[in-house]
Amino acid sequence: MTATPIDDPTTPIRPVDLFASFLHLHLDGRARAAEPVFQREGDGWQLMTFHVETDADVHGDHWEVHPEAEEVVACLAGGIRLYFRPERLGEAEEEVAVAAGSAVIVPRGRWHRIALDGPSDIMSLTVPRGSRLEKRG
């Protein structure tokens, strides 16, 4: 799939399947639908939507961090839990339940992971540049 310009006046206006594409929201105001590939080196924001069934679908065995921006994690259907890695030795993980129709804003630079309560639809928005994964110990 090649990038589909959403704001190009010569391109027909049509729906974008959010579960088959990622939306790239560029800093210059352009929006593009493209292959659902996480762009760690791109500019701007990336909107990602997923059908997920197991914790493996959300790499639940890894911590994730986004140093360039906050991340909005929304549960569209089902239910998820966000876990935040302790910032100090000896502290417990912080757990936040996210019901269908709600979202959490993950602070910039805060290590986090997702666990599912069951099959769910999730939407995420962040600046992916510099994002990292780290296997849970």
Residue ranges and their predicted role:
Residues W45, A69-V72, S120:
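Short, surface-exposed beta-edge/turn micro-motifs
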Residues M1-H62:
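A short, N-terminal "cap"/entry segment at the start of jelly-roll beta-barrel domains
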Residues D43-W45, V52-V58, A77-R81, R88, ...:
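Short, charged/polar surface micro-motifs in flexible loops or helix N-caps
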Residues E87-R108:
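Short acidic-glycine-tyrosine-enriched beta hairpin
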Residues A3-S21, D57, R113-G137:
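Double-stranded beta-helix
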Residues D55-D57, A100-G101, P107-G109, P119:
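Tight coil/turn sites that cap or link beta-strands
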Residues E64-V65, E70-C75, V96, V104, ...:
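His/acidic/aromatic-lined binding-pocket segments of jelly-roll/cupin-type domains
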Residues H66-L82, P86, L125:
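Short, conserved beta-strand element in jelly-roll/cupin
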